[in-house]
Amino acid sequence: MFVMDAINWLMARPVLCLLIFMFIRSMIQSRQPFPEAGGRTKGAHSTAEFDGLVKEGLTLVDFYATWCPPCKAAAPIYARMSEEEAFAKCTFAKVNVDEVRAVASSENVSAMPTFGFFEDGKRSTQVVGFSEAKIRQMLNSKLKLNTVNDNPPKELQKVD
């Protein structure tokens, strides 16, 4: 009888049921592990590892925090980008700002996520916040990729 009374009480309050459901869902999601790496991304867990990753060539670093919802949303997209053939000449790295505070401090990271572009050990550009379009644009620019084909194959060129 008590169970039926409780069910009837909850059914009469759909907004409360929705709020309870959302609360329980957020609690479950917050306990899921943060995807530190994926694709071709490499984690830097110390200053030495960070320095080794950015030392040569082009490196894109994702400065993230495990408690940051935009960082969690960006992680799978960042991992997929790292697997794209067009970006194979770029190293994709991740730095947990709470774990490697010295790197976050030395790179003046104050908002998460922040994506830093490093060329031969020196930061050249950064994107604060996650914008896949901006990051792709910067990667295309740094790798000198043509997003528009100025020289189409001869079959497609106009013949007079």
Predicted segments — roles?
Residues 63, 74-102:
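Thiol-based oxidoreductase modules, predominantly thioredoxin-like and allied folds used
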Residues 49, 99-103, 134:
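Short acidic active-site motifs
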Residues 1-7, 39-40, 145-160:
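Intrinsic disorder/low-complexity signal
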Residues 68-71:
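Hydrophobic heptad-repeat coiled-coil signature
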Residues 110-153:
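Non-catalytic, surface beta->alpha helical segment in thiol-disulfide oxidoreductase systems
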Residues 54-66:
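Short active-site neighborhood of thiol/selenol oxidoreductases, capturing the structured segment around
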Residues 1-38:
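N-terminal targeting signals for export/organelle localization
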Residues 31-54:
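N-terminal signal-anchor transmembrane helix
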